[in-house]
Amino acid sequence: MASFFSDFGLMWYLEELNKKEFVKFKEFLKQEVLQLGLKQVSWTEVKKASRQDLASLLLKHYEEKPAWDMTFRFFQKINRKDLIERAKREIDGCPKLYRAHMKTKMTHDSSRAFTISIQNFLKEKFTEDDYDCFENLFQSKGTESKPQVVFLSGGAGVGKTLMLKRLMLAWIESPVFLHKFSYIFYFCCREVKQLKTASLAELISREWPGPSAPIEEILSKPEKLLFIIDSLEGMECDLFKWESELCDNCTEKQPVNVLLSSLLRRKMLPESSLLISATPESFEKMENRIEYTHVKIIKGLKERNIKMSFHRLFQDRNRAHEAFSLVRENEQLFTVCQVPVLCWMVATCLKEEIEKGRDPVSICRCTTSLYTTHIFNLFIPQNAHSPSKKSQDQLQGLCSLAAEGMWTDTFVFGEEALRRNGIMDSDIPILLDIGMLINIRESEKSYIFLHPSVQEVCAAIFYLLKSHVDHPSQEVKSIEKLMFAFLKKVKVQWIFFGSFIFGLLHESEQKKLEAFFGHQLSQEIKRQLYQCLETISGNEELQEQIDGMKLFYCLFEMDDDTFLVEAMNCMEQINFVAKDYSDVIVAAHCLKHCFTLKKLSFSTQNVLSGAQEHSYMERLLTAWNHICSVFIISKDIQELRMKDTNLSESAFSVLYNNLKYHNYTLNVLVANNVFFVCEKYLFFELIQNCNLQHLNLSLTILSHSDVKLLCDVLSQAECNIEELVVAACSISSDDCKVFASVLISNKTLKHLNLASNTLDKGIASLCKSLCHPDCILEHLVLANCSLNEKCWDYLSEVLRRNKTLSHLDISSNDLKDEGLKVLCRALTLPDSVLKSLSLRHCLITISGCQDLAEVLRNNQNLVSLQVSNNKLEDTGVKLLCDAIKHPNCHLEDLGLEACELTGACCEDLASTFTQCKTLWAMNLLKNALDYNGLVVLCEALKQQTCATYVLGLQITDFDTETQAFLVAEQEKNPCLRILSSL
């Protein structure tokens, strides 16, 4: 009972009383407390006490058992026996029983690899820092208490599940969360996916210790529930597609993707809290679609944990040190060891090699070598030199199973899948015993590989042994399709698959495979891989889609210099993101052999920021120098794009020295969200290049002195920059004067993007220059620039006098109808030259549509109008449609996204399709259009007089009937393109 009171149980039950019952409770407390032989509490305090205050008073004045007995007595008198029964179960039973069950389940968990050394991490004592870390995840900001939605983001297998298990143990064993959550339920998406359909009640019952869970009681306090959704990427589907199918009934069976989507989208139990783990790729897809309260990045085991694991396993201190040193010297293996189960695998493999008297250095040559050595060791008995025929068949069956899983996005396998791939029922206990397979749930015959990367290496081995045409599943595709899917990151779950294929082609790996399986391997696969690279070489669009780091790791694992040089010189365009030390080393290994590069795009995030230890920084800078040497050895680099990169002074110096005398071929330079520790004039020296035509510095902070340096370059006679993008660069109103002079003096600048800078008063000086006859600017973006009502007169004057400006974007400013009226006076003039106007998020209403309609009837040059995210409504759009049908209107593209339209306006919209001969695109996303309205639109789109063929609609936003109708209309009308983004 002590723990229950410490959990504020009394307060919870007092909150269950309505106002009348609560008053009666207080009166009984005043009348009967002396009869019970207890000390009287001040009536003044009791009378004014809230439920929380009264709970505190009772806990303060009475011992726990008497206080609880008294509470039961008063509940009886006010006829709330239901609370008594529930409270007794709570004190003696349900949450306590559940916590005890979960503790037993986790500490004796055979459902995953926790039976190995992972148990050591679960058994580590919790420190105060651990508790603080866990508690901070669910700390509400400010005084408002609201449901928490927390993301754990980290690579596959990096230890997210381990952290979730430790968090649950912390909740079970300590008071860290007991006051916050009555129940924590853990759902692994890869397991849930196997169910196909389920209700939330059924998922909860699966975790319950008894035959049936008290669902009604559990769900009665949703704010006391935490749902852990682990490995969200395991659902392998878009959980945001089923808007119309979301459900709030916890007992109703749903497809599991709809069920999880209902939880994530807060349709079901919105008062509950969520803790979601996902890979960075999955998180990136969702971060703008879920309102989360906290994100924690999981980077895996720290060096001390890895070292400790080796010492625990080896016991012999010297051997442990030898093995750990080998791993520490190999950055790729060390990165692998940050994943708990792989740390155990690496240490086990090295231990076995050392105990057999073999040289462990050879298997640390690359990651592939260590994986294959570990796997082959599992199948070869301790004193044998080669595997039995049965072992060969078992591994071959596993490789076939793994390949099927990679192509079908399956990581949990039933017995039928095992049999289909040649694994007999009698093989399963052996594969479980050696640790190749793991039974994820004792009550169900479902299995996973030790780790997804083990499945990947087995799948790679399949391709070295057989052709895809020999596989029992037609889902398994050719090596060419595999490599393109891997390099283009079509399947985000494929982390090592392609690089293992390359790694297995190394001579030493070929010998190991031939020795294990007893036959020579075909060399055809190497030729096929080179053909893939040649295909990429001749296709610029394909090169844009290739993930450079994936390609680099493939070539690094192969460790074949001849093939590396040939492969790198197939590439004219490379795009890579280096997220850690290992990535930089691998990228350097490849790029120093690239002689044909024309376009380079990279991000090094904070890897080169100088935060590392001195010894690491030296090695990093050497590798960074190899990367930057590509500017010297590739003689024709035309585009350089840097993004999300923080360079220390030393790192910038390396870039500068390699680029300074070899930047003359650059015509595009992009530095987005880049931070340099250097003398800024050095960077601006790099853009003094007469061939440079496009410069984009968005999200890179520019001081006033930086702006002056930039404008000095722009003012030089030899400057040929045509497009300048300085969006979100912290440019101020004072900086506008500097830019204003450039608009007059520069004879090449045609595009200027100043979006998301606070220009305010500075717009006056810009507009003055824009009115100057020497200004040749054609394209101006001032979106989200904090423009106010005084700015519209200045811009109106520009629209009257400037004869070159064809595009103006002033979206996300408080234009309002009054400001729009000022601009429209200029736009209705017969000599207006503006062709494109963007007014998204400008607080325009129906009234403003009257002025826009006047422009459309009089301005024959305007071909694009974007008025999305304004409250135009059906009435306002009718005004626009009537104007679009006017013979003087030549509009081609109209944006009406999120304009609060309904199906009632579809007749008006449809009439523009058939009567306007120029309108080819209309964006209608995020409007409440209905089935009948869409039928009208689609009927118009089929008419011969219709010029429109691009329609912005999110098909999945509609109900099932409407979705089917739109899909059918697209099939009937081959010219029609319905797009979910415009």
UniProtKB/Swiss-Prot annotation:
One of its GO terms (molecular function) is ATP binding. InterPro entries: DAPIN, DEATH-like_dom_sf, Leu-rich_rpt, LRR_dom_sf, NACHT_NTPase, NLRP_HD2, NLRP_innate_immun_reg, NOD1/2_WH. Keywords: ATP-binding, Inflammatory response, Leucine-rich repeat, Nucleotide-binding, Repeat. GO terms for biological process: inflammatory response. The keyword Nucleotide-binding applies. Pfam families: LRR_6 (PF13516), NACHT (PF05729), NLRC4_HD2 (PF17776), NOD2_WH (PF17779), PYRIN (PF02758). LRR repeats lie at residues 594-618, 634-658, 689-712, 746-773, 777-801, 802-825, 827-847, 859-882, 888-911, 916-943. May be involved in inflammation and recognition of cytosolic pathogen-associated molecular patterns (PAMPs) not intercepted by membrane-bound receptors. This is NACHT, LRR and PYD domains-containing protein 4A. It comes from Mus musculus (Mouse).
